[in-house]
């Protein structure tokens, strides 16, 4: 995981491989509520394979001839997986939605019903995972996995952001965000459209090289349909170029051409990159203990004030409170003591200040920041073996990453 160095469990790693096939990695959303069956909005319980949530939403919006902003979902789900989740289409009849199912690639509509309310981001309890680990590398992988899961139940799981947060497989959205926070909008656009990486197809690499040469027309012509977001960014740049009006504002327009969830993700990815480093260094001091200077939150995300160290220690051991690290932003409080030293050193190493997160040249992409727990709780764990390999099952809260659990089991970086 990007910028993650620390393990919190004492077991050896099972090794192995995940996601050999999409069906090796299953995710099912744990909803906060079920739709009522009546109302102006249509909720769809979808199963998708090998596709991002955002791509599916865009396809459904296109087939229904709707603005993407009419679509709602509770959380992004993995691309390289089989996932099930609710999505919502506002002010649309279920019959209209059912009519387009066959036109949405690699997606099944398992249930289509109505509801009074729309579905908003974050409106889920968590996610349930069933993951097959193939080709394990030790003699007793099942016993090791069970021991690791038990330790994680006792201590908590490091709350690292997974590779998906950074735009896997390119995993460079944090670099786009870093450029934005540093005030370099051109550098942000260049990082996203250009900069071919090893492992990309030749046509994709050639399109990126054309962009890096400054040949925007050729880059656009070369780009396959899979580069839909790069093409979105290039359109306003090409329009300005053809009119002889190309300027620094053209790069701002390129960012604004993207769907809102994606363009917001850039700064969030950079915050996540820094957060992972803070978690890694803080977890090395003990993930389930209070260190003087910690900012501690309860399960409702409220900072706990005026509690003595012994009380905080007991709350943390009982999973009623959690040490935190910063998602850096213009208004986030920083810890004191040893945790605070870690947090301030990270800013110094990056050459940024908290205020830089609110001084971004692209409007509405700044962030005030927040404190986030350095660990999360895992529940309903299970593990078993078959001829295919080792299967682990567990549930985790919304916004947390299964790869953090797998990393502890396998003792290797996982994507």
UniProtKB/Swiss-Prot annotation:
The keyword Disulfide bond does not apply. Its EC number is 5.4.99.27. Could be responsible for synthesis of pseudouridine from uracil-13 in transfer RNAs. It comes from the Archaea. The gene is truD. It catalyses: uridine(13) in tRNA = pseudouridine(13) in tRNA. GO terms for molecular function: RNA binding; tRNA pseudouridine(13) synthase activity. The active site is at 78 (nucleophile). Keywords: Isomerase, tRNA processing. The keyword NADP does not apply. Transmembrane segments: none annotated. One of its GO terms (biological process) is tRNA pseudouridine synthesis. This is Probable tRNA pseudouridine synthase D. Belongs to the pseudouridine synthase TruD family. It holds the Pfam family TruD. Residues 156-376 form the TRUD domain. InterPro entries: PsdUridine_synth_cat_dom_sf, PsdUridine_synth_TruD, PsdUridine_synth_TruD_CS, PsdUridine_synth_TruD_insert, TruD_catalytic.
């Amino acid at each position: 995981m990007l910028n993650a160095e620390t393990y919190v469990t004492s077991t050896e790693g099972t090794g192995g491989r995940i996601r050999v096939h999409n069906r090796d990695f299953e995710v099912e959303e744990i909803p906060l509520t079920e739709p009522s069956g009546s109302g102006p909005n249509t909720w769809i319980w979808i199963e998708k394979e090998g596709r991002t949530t955002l791509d599916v939403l865009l396809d459904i919006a296109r087939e229904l001839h709707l603005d993407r902003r009419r679509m709602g979902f509770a959380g992004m789900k993995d691309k390289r997986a089989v996932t099930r989740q609710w999505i919502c289409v506002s002010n649309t009849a279920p019959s209209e939605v059912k009519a387009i199912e066959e036109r949405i690639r690699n997606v099944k509509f398992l249930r289509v019903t109505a509801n009074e309310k729309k579905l908003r981001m974050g409106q889920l309890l968590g996610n349930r995972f069933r993951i097959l680990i193939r080709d394990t590398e030790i003699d007793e992988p099942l016993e090791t996995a069970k021991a690791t899961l038990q330790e994680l139940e006792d201590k908590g799981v490091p709350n690292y952001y997974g590779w998906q947060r950074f735009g896997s497989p390119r995993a460079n959205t944090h670099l786009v965000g870093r450029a934005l926070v540093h005030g370099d909008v051109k550098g942000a656009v260049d990082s996203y459209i250009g900069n071919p990486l090893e492992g990309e197809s030749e046509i994709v690499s050639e399109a990126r090289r054309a962009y890096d040469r400054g040949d925007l027309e050729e880059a656009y012509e070369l780009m396959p349909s899979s580069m839909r977001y790069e093409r979105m960014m290039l359109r306003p740049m090409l329009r300005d170029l053809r009119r002889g009006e190309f300027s620094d504002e053209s790069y701002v327009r390129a960012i604004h051409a993207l769907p809102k969830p994606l363009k917001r993700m850039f700064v969030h990815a950079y915050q996540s990159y820094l957060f992972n480093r803070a978690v890694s260094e803080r977890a090395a001091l003990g993930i389930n203990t209070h260190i003087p200077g910690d900012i501690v939150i309860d399960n409702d995300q409220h900072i706990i004030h005026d509690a003595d160290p012994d009380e905080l220690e007991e709350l943390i051991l009982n999973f009623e409170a959690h040490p935190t690290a910063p998602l850096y932003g213009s208004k986030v409080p920083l810890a004191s003591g040893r945790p605070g030293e870690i947090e301030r050193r990270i800013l110094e190493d990056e050459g940024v200040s908290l205020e830089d997160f609110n001084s971004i040249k692209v409007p509405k992409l700044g962030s005030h920041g927040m404190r986030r727990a350095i660990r999360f709780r895992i529940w309903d764990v299970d593990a078993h073996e078959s001829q295919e390999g080792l299967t682990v099952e567990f549930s985790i809260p919304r916004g947390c990453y299964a790869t953090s659990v797998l990393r502890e089991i396998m003792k290797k970086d996982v994507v």
